[in-house]
Regions:
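N-terminal entrance/gating region of PLP-dependent enzymes' catalytic architecture
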Residues: 2-4, 8-12, 23-172
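Glycine- and acidic
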Residues: 35-41, 83, 139-147, 169-176, ...
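General structural feature for long, well-ordered alpha-helical segments within catalytic domains
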Residues: 48-51, 55, 59, 93, ...
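Well-ordered mid-protein domain cores that form the structural environment of catalytic cofactors
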Residues: 124-215, 223, 229-230
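Conserved PLP-enzyme active-site core in the AAT-like
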Residues: 151, 184-187, 191-358
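Active-site C-terminal subdomain of aminotransferase-like
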Residues: 328-407
Length: 407
């Protein structure tokens, strides 16, 4: 039996191979019989096309037969099916693999496209996004450096610019695609933390010297129904869950501006340091949008980082009828926006954007082998300089294809 390691070892030979194995039917033979036959390469295009055709057929069959969004199966009922699987022994061919997948996954998958599905914020997806997903998986670009992505870098940057223009963040804005709202919120609060800490006396900065003694006094203010990713972010940032101070909401489930003002005053009186205020544009449970303008003005008057979690409601930037609900976002220092929610994109597709691109320096590290500082000075657009990730999928392609084909 050949393994993944065997495939990697023979990659060089496979790239130039024209073996007969590569021309045979992809789902009627075993890929384990020849590591060369399993590699995506020019020699295996017939096999790739055959496999993609079969997978497309399977998806169509599944969607045509789905009667409800979810079967309701429990973990206890499904887990035994995995108990005796031997991952060291591959199945005989693609058809066998797909049959197994139907039983283990597709039969009980959650079908978000179904008109009766309303349980979560996951959305049905548009065709351009699905087509792009197939393309980006095949080409497999990594968006960390220019020399690995070229045009992909510029596509992503143009989409970031489009997003910040729609949000009204101004000409100094910038950002980066992320895996989702949780990562975007983490990144935004990291930037807020480091922006506050670099202003402290006798502290040379978090990146080189770690957190200052004052870090235990940093606080984040958000409504009592804001997303739990804020607590997770504060834990990861060394501040702890309790660094998030919940602010009361009004009868419309929006952050109460007066309650925020009181909370900020009380924190100052107790010697605490307001690090950031997070306004939610679309709460998970109610879809409520905090009074962004009032909160933004409060933050600006006090010199506090203003973050808008628009993971859910950010899609309103495309709405002529309802876009006014996001008025005030233009005052934000950072914004989270999930394209894989109200933009109908396949998971994952999200972004964290900032009003002042220089704040992105807090996530920058120059590695000589990858993104040396000289390249940055010369203007090479290495996206890793403003990302928490290094290797990163070309998820921006999904939104790009959608805008180019649908508008």
């Amino acid at each position: 039996m050949h393994s993944l390691q065997d495939s990697a070892a023979t990659y060089g030979a496979a790239a130039g191979s024209s073996s007969s194995d590569a021309q045979t039917d992809a789902y009627a033979r075993s890929l384990s019989s020849s590591p060369r036959a399993a590699l995506f390469s020019p020699a295996n295009m017939d096999a790739w096309q055959t496999g993609m055709d079969r997978i497309s057929q399977l998806v169509a069959e599944q969607l045509d037969s789905v009667q409800q969004p979810f079967s309701g199966i429990t973990p206890e009922a499904l887990r035994p099916a995995f108990a005796d699987l031997d991952l060291e022994t591959p199945l005989e061919n693609l058809e066998a693999g797909l049959e197994e997948l139907k039983s283990l996954y597709l039969k009980d998958a959650v079908y978000f496209h179904h008109p009766r599905y309303i349980a979560h914020l996951n959305c049905p997806v548009v065709l351009p996004g699905v087509w792009a997903e197939s393309l980006l998986g095949a080409i497999n670009s990594s968006l960390d450096t220019w020399d690995q992505s070229a045009g992909g870098t510029l596509i992503e940057q143009r989409l970031i610019d489009w997003t910040t223009e729609r949000l009204g963040l101004g000409p100094t804005a910038d950002g980066i695609f992320t895996s989702g709202g949780t990562q975007s919120n983490l990144m935004a609060l990291l930037l807020a933390r480091d922006a506050v800490c670099e202003k402290l006396p006798n502290h040379p900065g978090n990146q080189t010297h770690g957190l200052p003694p004052e870090a235990g006094r940093l606080r984040v203010f958000a409504s009592g129904i804001s997303h739990f990713s804020l607590q997770k972010a504060c834990a990861l940032l060394g501040l702890g869950h309790n660094a998030v101070i919940p602010v009361a909401v009004d009868e419309r489930r929006r952050m109460d501006h007066e309650a925020l003002r009181d909370a900020l005053d009380n924190a100052r009186a107790e010697g605490l340091i307001p690090m950031a205020v997070v306004a939610t544009a679309g709460t998970t449970d109610f879809g409520s949008i905090d009074p962004l303008q009032a909160i933004g003005r409060e933050c600006h008057a006090r010199g506090i980082w203003f973050h808008v979690d628009g993971a859910y409601g950010g899609g309103l930037i495309t709405s002529r009828r309802h876009g006014h609900w996001l008025k005030g976002t233009e005052m934000a220092d950072s914004v989270t926006i999930d394209y894989h929610k109200t933009f109908f994109q396949p998971v994952s597709c999200s972004a964290c954007v900032v009003r002042d691109r220089t704040q992105l320096r807090h996530v920058t590290y120059h590695a000589d082998y990858l993104n040396p500082e000289l390249q940055a000075r010369e203007g090479t657009p290495d996206q890793v300089n403003k990302s928490l990730q290094t290797t990163r999928r070309f998820d921006a392609l999904k939104l790009w294809m959608t805008l180019r084909l649908m508008g």
